[in-house]
């Protein structure tokens, strides 16, 4: 009988929830950090056309998968250099609508709609929309984006 009770206790203990970091719910602070990673990366890197900001938002091995193309930090830098050479390029403003933000251990997964407006001299010259997902990971430098997936939504 003692063995049955011991076995029952052991099996019950194995079923208890684990309170490790992996099972911790997303905090309001982490949600704000995740949203700032997305908004800040688009405002400063893509809208601000500043490749120096990549280190503040991306991991070293960051990639974007967009419409069959793989973008890494080096490819983004080349793109930004090209943007600097464009005369009279429009300003880009992005707005996000979040579908979900969930934490898994030391990572945060996000899904959102990304709306961009392109303005030149107070005139709207274009609009784009994407359906995107992103993965942020906790690093020694703080939270950084590790991967994104982007699908263009037809206008």
Q: Where does each model-flagged region fall?
A:
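A short, structured loop/turn motif at beta-sheet edges
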Residues: 101-108, 136-142
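A short hydrophobic beta-strand element
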Residues: 106-116
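Short, surface-exposed coil-to-beta transition loops
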Residues: 93-96, 111-113, 126-132
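A solvent-exposed, acidic/Ser-Thr-rich amphipathic alpha-helical stretch
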Residues: 51-104, 124
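Beta-strand elements of well-folded, non-transmembrane domains
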Residues: 102, 116-120
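Short beta-strand edge/turn micro-motifs at domain boundaries
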Residues: 129-155
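Short, low-complexity N-terminal intrinsically disordered segments enriched in polar/charged residues
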Residues: 14-56
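Sec-dependent N-terminal signal peptides
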Residues: 3-12
């Amino acid at each position: 009988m003692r063995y049955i009770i011991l076995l029952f206790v052991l099996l019950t203990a194995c079923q208890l929830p684990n309170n490790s970091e992996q099972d911790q719910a997303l905090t309001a602070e982490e949600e704000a950090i995740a949203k700032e990673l997305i908004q800040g990366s688009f405002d400063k890197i893509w809208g601000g056309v500043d490749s120096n900001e990549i280190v503040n938002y991306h991991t070293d091995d960051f990639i974007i998968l967009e419409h069959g193309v793989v973008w890494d930090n080096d490819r983004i830098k080349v793109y930004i250099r090209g943007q600097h050479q464009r005369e009279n390029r429009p300003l880009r403003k992005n707005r996000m609508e979040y579908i979900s933000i969930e934490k898994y251990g030391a990572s945060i997964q996000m899904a959102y709609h990304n709306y961009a407006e392109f303005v030149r001299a107070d005139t709207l010259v274009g609009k784009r929309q994407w359906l995107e997902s992103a993965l942020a990971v906790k690093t020694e430098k703080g939270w950084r984006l590790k991967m994104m997936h982007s699908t263009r939504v037809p206008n």
